[in-house]
């Protein structure tokens, strides 16, 4: 456990750089403006958090945090998922619904599986587990949710993204490069700090004492109760 914790930071950096490199290639091939994708991420991350919060309220009768980060109601899974769908499915607007559905279901299943694996191997935490559901794949995704991804892909390509794209084009702040850059830097710092807080949380649970000033800062400002309030469904590996 201690050895895994010791090298987890390097593992996160390596996998993160690989993901960024892959996304950059996909974005370049899609021809979609990077600034627009940043706004797609921000809007989708916000809407995803709101949808999940309302869903939990309706299903369980309680208000539960569904945010992926320490600051702000943003779901990174939804945000990145929207960007992935936008980039991968670009150019498929005129394709038959069945084709978009199958490609979207396949991509969505891979995306959900990779997200689950990534958070478990890097953060030592499990945020969802579908082992109890039939036709699940390693507990990380299942055929039912892959079908949901397929349906969402059709709706995204045929209706949501075209409308969102036009909405973004009309935003005055979209044409201010500085605002877009500030949002991007904010979310990157927010995600990095959130990951650091989660890693330190798993270290504390494993009995690892703070050994650096950063560890001490995180322990003083992001105690267990705060982490568990933001991520109430999180399970330790």
Functional labels for PLM-detected ranges:
Residues 1-237:
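Aromatic-rich, lipid-facing transmembrane alpha helices and their immediate juxtamembrane interface loops
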């Amino acid at each position: 456990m201690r050895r895994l914790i010791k090298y987890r930071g390097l593992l996160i950096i390596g996998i993160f750089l690989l993901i960024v490199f892959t996304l950059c290639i996909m974005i370049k091939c899609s021809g979609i403006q990077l600034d627009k994708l940043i706004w797609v991420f921000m809007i989708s991350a916000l809407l995803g958090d709101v949808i999940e919060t309302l869903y939990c309220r309706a299903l369980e009768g309680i208000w539960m945090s569904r945010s992926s980060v320490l600051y702000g109601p943003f779901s990174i899974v939804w945000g990145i998922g929207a960007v992935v769908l936008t980039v991968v499915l670009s150019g498929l607007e005129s394709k038959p619904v069945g084709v978009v559905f199958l490609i979207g279901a396949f991509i969505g299943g891979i995306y959900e599986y990779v997200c689950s694996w990534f958070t478990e191997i890097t953060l030592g935490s499990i945020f969802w587990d579908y082992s109890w559901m039939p036709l699940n794949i390693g507990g990380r995704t299942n055929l039912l949710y892959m079908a949901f991804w397929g349906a969402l892909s059709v709706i995204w390509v045929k209706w949501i993204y075209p409308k969102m794209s036009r909405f973004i084009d009309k935003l005055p702040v979209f044409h201010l490069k500085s605002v877009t850059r500030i949002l991007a830097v904010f979310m990157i710092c927010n995600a990095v700090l959130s990951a650091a807080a989660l890693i330190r949380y798993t270290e504390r649970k494993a009995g690892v004492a703070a050994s650096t000033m950063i560890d001490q800062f995180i322990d003083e400002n992001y105690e267990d109760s705060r982490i568990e309030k933001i991520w109430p469904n999180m399970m330790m590996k």
